[in-house]
A protein has these predicted regions:
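Hydrophobic protein-protein interaction segments
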Residues: 2-189
């Protein structure tokens, strides 16, 4: 099981004004700050086996409603998963995830059959959040040299933009309603 270093967890909390998360193999969500949970979903509230960004994007209807370019985002997530399969072809958790997605999503089956391998370390996502409306956020995905299977993904908006204002509103408007995310339990797998 992958672990997030305490210093990295501290960094996530320190960049509390912007959504940030640590992704592991298969795009497992290993940790996220409060803004990531407000913007996307509270992955810590999900069963351990469901704390996966690709799984959430493909199978959760709230993700389909959130991403304005859902098909593009989902197809890119499938391409990144295929890249992970290439790096770790005999990983049982990866094979289980691919099987689950194939059983439950026709889109996934089509994209998987296309054999597209891709990974973007930076880009833009367009969202329609149920509380703050439309956002356009840039993301950067940074590799972590101490653990090549972990990445830090940070989402930001251009300063002074309506998206920046929406993130501020989301942060302040929901501050009392959403508790700080709990770290993953040691017995998670």
């Amino acid at each position: 099981m992958q672990k997030v270093r305490p210093g990295l967890r501290q960094l996530l909390d320190a960049v509390g004004d912007v959504p940030a998360m640590v992704l592991g193999r298969r795009a497992d969500v290993l940790a996220g700050n409060r803004m990531a949970h407000l913007l996307f979903t509270d992955f810590t509230a999900l069963p351990a086996a469901e704390r996966n960004l690709t799984r959430w994007i493909i199978l959760d209807p709230s993700a389909g409603a959130l991403f304005r370019d859902w098909k593009t985002v989902a197809a890119e997530a499938v391409g990144a998963l295929r890249m992970d399969v290439g790096r770790h072809p005999n990983d049982p958790q990866t094979n289980q995830l691919v099987g689950e997605l194939a059983v439950h999503s026709e889109h996934f089956r089509q994209w998987w059959a296309g054999h597209r391998v891709a990974s973007r370390s930076a880009g833009t996502v367009r969202l329609h959040h149920p509380i703050v409306g439309d956002l356009e956020l840039n993301f950067e995905t940074l590799s972590l040299p101490d653990d090549p299977d972990q990445m830090l993904r940070v989402y930001s908006a251009k300063a002074g933009s309506p998206s920046s204002d929406a993130l501020t509103l989301l942060s302040f408007g929901e501050a009392a309603a959403v508790p700080e995310p709990e770290p993953a339990r040691r017995d998670d797998s």
